[in-house]
Amino acid sequence: MRVKGIRKNYQHLWRWGTMLLGILMICSAAEQLWVTVYYGVPVWKEAATTLFCASDAKAYDTEVHNVWATHACVPTDPNPQEVVLENVTEKFNMWKNNMVEQMHEDIISLWDQSLKPCVKLTPLCVTLNCIDWGNDTSPNATNTTSSGGEKMEKGEMKNCSFNITTSIRDKVQKEHALFYKHDVVPINNSTKDNIKNDNSTRYRLISCNTSVITQACPKISFEPIPIHYCAPAGFAIIKCNDKKFNGTGPCTNVSTVQCTHGIKPVVSTQLLLNGSLAEEEVVIRSENFTDNAKTIIVQLKEPVVINCTRPSKTTRRRIHIGPGRAFYTTKQIAGDLRQAHCNINRARWNATLKQIVGKLRKQFVNKTIVFNRSSGGDPEIVMHSFNCGGEFFYCNSTQLFNSTWLSNSTWNDTEGSNNTGGNDTITLPCRIKQIINMWQEVGKAMYAPPIEGQIRCSSNITGLLLTRDGGDNQNETETFRPGGGNMRDNWRSELYKYKVVKIELLGVAPTKAKRRVVQREKRAVGIGAVFLGFLGAAGSTMGASMTLTVQARLLLSGIVQQQNNLLRAIEGQQHLLQLTVWGIKQLQARILAVERYLKDQQLLGIWGCSGKLICTTAVPWNASWSNKSLEEIWDNMTWMEWEREIDNYTSLIYTLIEESQNQQEKNEQELLGLDKWASLWNWFTITNWLWYIRIFIMIVGGLVGLRIVFTVLSIVNRVRQGYSPLSFQTRLPAPRGPDRPEGIEEEGGDRDRDRSGQLVDGLLAIIWVDLRSLCLFSYHRLRDLLLIVTRIVELLGRRGWEALKYWWNLLQYWSQELKNSAVSLFNAIAIAVAEGTDRVLKILQRAFRAILHIPTRIRQGLERALL
């Protein structure tokens, strides 16, 4: 009875255990997540890539060659697309922007390339015999008018004669040319006082001892033309639209564009010309306001117009300085001989300074703001230098930066209008230089040929470059001076709100969908989603931003469009048989875009996801990558946030997907070996029938061989027993009728089982009998073997079950014995402890009583002693 109860309880426990295991398997299968690949997700990362240019084809004169080579740029998009990214915050840093470095290198390359075919003026590095060319020698001199500008000083121009090689190398002739006095330096041994008095006559060009002077080509133009920097396919430009953005930190109003706005590459110092304006108020930007070595870039809200002019009319002539080379110099200066100058409205300038001071006071609280002139250095830094109509002006900006602003917002102009033509206009005296130290690098100089006629240009001052004096912080005055010279700050003032990002079209995320492995059926791709635009859903949650096809299509279409633009640009310059900087950048951008596209497609192909936007995999999602639930991921996170979370595990996930796909391909290859069994119709093909015939012949041959072997063995066995083999000609007894049972007269009924078979006639009959006997033999042997195995398994199962029951009963018995022993031991210990405790308590009780009886014993002793 006890054994039966144990068996029933065991079966009950087995049933419940099976149910619990099934429930656990179902729950584990329901919660299992799998990696899913998405192509076209709105995710980007900061990158430094090759940008190409776009320019308006009608923005320049086709007759002249502008130094910016914008004819090699692609045409601007008449309808540029700008997609606002909702709920997106992006970090910018204008001081560490690769776009600035790239533009700087591009402008340097353009200048170098434009001057490369031009004439080197090395033959002019000879001794010049010069005399002053003053305005008193010209009969056409006029007086200074009220429009501003001082009369040209005597000695401002030098009339120099020199010996030069003609078109015939061994022939030298004497020529003369006019140079500005700041373009030549004396080379005699006169003292400094003589040089100061300017009474020397022997000169040389200023840069002959340090630089190679290159004359700008005659038809070259330095007029700035807006250049749009564009990102290649697979990349994008992120733009910050915050109106008070200081250039660093997070920006909440973000959009994506393919090209920047038109940036005019104006090469100037101190003042930023013809740039972009602030929208709401003046903005000052600096990498660190507390570091006086850092330049402060000021962006104005409203422009200040500066009108510059060279009043005199100039003509030029050409001097041959060798075979195929010519030097252009000033032939005659006529008309108004006033000095070149620039005019600025005083009230407008003072109002601008007041706005700038208000912004500076937020950084330098309770300080007196002082604007002072440049502290010294190269002429390009000390003066406001820029290009006006092809001539390089160097203007004294002291009158612009010569004021003190007290903490109560009052100001004091230290010079006032003493040096101006009136109270309403600030006139800056300018001088013109023809030999320019190249701002790109040391050791190069350029000679700008004189421009004929009068020169007038009007520009907008849109920003300033300031530096702050260092010193004791206890000083209550902060002095700011005009700066510049590093053209990166000029480009940075326009590119501060842009950054280049690389679009990461591939994304992985967990889903409940698992790839059906070893499935060769092709399914069409369909997505019921609304396409919001390129990266337009970057701020939406992962479940709501199903804009995958937009990025995928625009990437390929962008490559094709860029290729067409490149071919059009190359076609326009094919007569030159060379590419400009922009053409090379076009090629680089094209190759880069194709490489990125092919790389993504290669990964998709390796993962078995070619042509799919959503691709499930057989890779289980590891909770160590991210333990968030599906609801937290798909309903609350954007793709950008999700990408940042799993960025450290992306390469590992990619590797696992590749390994899983490789394993699946191996499984498919093995399955193809069994694929011919998938259709029964293939069994009836002629190829299979030939195999069937071959197999049949082999089987028949094997049976015949076995028959022969068995026959020989039977004969040998019977011979050994004393029998002789019967002749094959022995006839069988005639079969009897149904009314006569076989056997002898004494015997009746059916035939007993004979030990030997019948002898038959004919090949087919023999084959049939042999085949039948072989099949029966095989069947009997297999049946016996199966019965033996079944008996053994049954016996082992019964013995095993009995052994298990025995061990279970034995375990229960010894468990009960151990339990009883433990209880007995516990009881014995408890009894022993109780007895010991009683003895201790009795001893303590007796001792206590003895102590209590001590006074009584003392009293009794005293009583006995007294008696």
UniProtKB/Swiss-Prot annotation:
Region listing for Fusion peptide, in residue ranges:
524-544
Domain of life from the UniProt record? Viruses
Motif annotated as Di-leucine internalization motif, chain positions? 866-867
Membrane-spanning segments: 696-716
Where do the segments described as V4 lie? 395-430
Q: Does the keyword Ion transport apply?
A: no
Q: Where is the lipid attached (S-palmitoyl cysteine)?
A: C775
Would the keyword Signal turn up in this protein's UniProt record? yes
Name which cysteines form disulfide bonds: C53-C73, C118-C217, C125-C208, C130-C160, C230-C259, C240-C251, C308-C342, C388-C457, C395-C430, C609-C615
The residue spans the entry assigns to the Cytoplasmic side of the membrane are as follows 717-867
One Gene Ontology biological process = virion attachment to host cell
In this entry, the parts of the chain located on the Extracellular side of the membrane are 32-695
Q: What is this protein called?
A: Envelope glycoprotein gp160
Q: Which gene encodes it?
A: env
